[in-house]
Amino acid sequence: MFSPLIDQLINSLRHLPGVGPKSAQRMALHLLERDREGAQNLSEVLAKAVEHVHRCQQCRTLTEQALCNICSNARRNRKELCIVETPADVIAIETSAVFSGYYFVLLGRLSPIDGIGPKEIGMDVLASRFAEGEIEEVIIATNPTIEGEATAHYISERAKAQGIKVSRIAHGIPIGGELEYVDGGTLAHAISRRQEI
């Protein structure tokens, strides 16, 4: 519709979650018409992030160092491990300020139909952490979806086999909801009222 380069920019912006064709077009035109300096800055920062941000070696969240700020913090409770689906879930729980343990990011959830099995969500790495014997409680904070519940059950069985106490965050979170969209108060209540499973 526009020039090939503008069309390419619009299509690239459509890859962002929640951005449809109209929003992508508005963003592209705004950056090109009214905020070229902002567009240049966005381009530079995005290129740096793509080059330097990678997965934490211990919890698999996003970081610029080998270990993220949480995993490298010796003051956190090493006996508690909260298991989440995405780095956005770590941010959501950290914002609630009610959890002081460590995290493990699955980077998804079990979904055999989509070809996502235990290996794809890092169960081999997680099983190794369980076997180390340092973790006393696992708090499962997967989303309350069918796949999230199946993933929680699978992880629960593996942790219990190692003698680890397992709890699931309480359901103050709406069924079918995503953790990154839940307000801090609701999330704080859900974590503080977690239940053993």
Curated annotation (Swiss-Prot):
GO molecular function: DNA binding; zinc ion binding
Zn finger region (C4-type): 56-71
GO biological process terms on file: DNA recombination; DNA repair
Keywords linked to the UniProt accession: DNA damage, DNA recombination, DNA repair, Metal-binding, Zinc, Zinc-finger
Gene3D superfamilies named among the record's database cross-references: 3.40.1360.10, 6.10.250.240, RecR Domain 1
Zinc found in the keyword field: yes
Stored CDD domains: TOPRIM_recR
Domain of life: Bacteria
Residues covered by the Toprim domain: 79-174
Pfam family membership, one: RecR_C
Matching SUPFAM superfamilies: Recombination protein RecR
Biological role: May play a role in DNA repair. It seems to be involved in an RecBC-independent recombinational process of DNA repair. It may act with RecF and RecO.
UniProt record similarity statement: Belongs to the RecR family.
Protein's recorded name: Recombination protein RecR
Source organism of the structure: Saccharophagus degradans (strain 2-40 / ATCC 43961 / DSM 17024)
